[in-house]
Amino acid sequence: MGFVDANTISKMSRLRCGVPDHFSLNKSHELHLHIPTFSSHYTFYPGHPKWPRTKRRLTYSFQPGTRTDVINPILHATQMWASVSHFTFTQARSHNRANIKISFQFGDHGDGFPFDGPGGTLAHAFPPSDGRLHFDGDETWVDGVLPGAIDMQTVGLHELGHILGLGHSPDYNSIMSPFFGSGQRKFLGQDDIDGIRALYQS
């Protein structure tokens, strides 16, 4: 029989990504799980979906009417992923033709993963090559660190990892950890870099 300890309750009450945590472990993780110092924690979606070799130049777009102050944080997030991979990201003029479609949604918005209002689930994204990235429009989004608010760049960086094919990492220092704190900014960690390079063998 399982039990809920203080640590579990703390995690359950944290802000988090809405993507489920059931991912397949990478081979390196399976081989080195017994050696924590050298283990990797990155995971992939079942079947390891990824963008085809012909799609290394990805376009992204915001749903028309999206507030302009979220554009730069997402730009910076794409630049971070580009700096450690073979991907490039360009903002598209047409939302419908973009590889990555970014939007703010509220409550039940028709994709099977309803948002829950302020707190709780912050955002979710779909694996390659779906390209949908949804932020919960009920959250307080900012560019930077502000108590009680959510950093758009941090969550965008995480969700773009899902868009590229990475799952959640149990390493809280990884950008792919499913948990976030308000008033917090995170960056790519070595585990994230190792994961994207392993998935695309670069």
Model-derived regions: residue spans:
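Zinc-dependent metalloendopeptidases
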Residues: 1-202
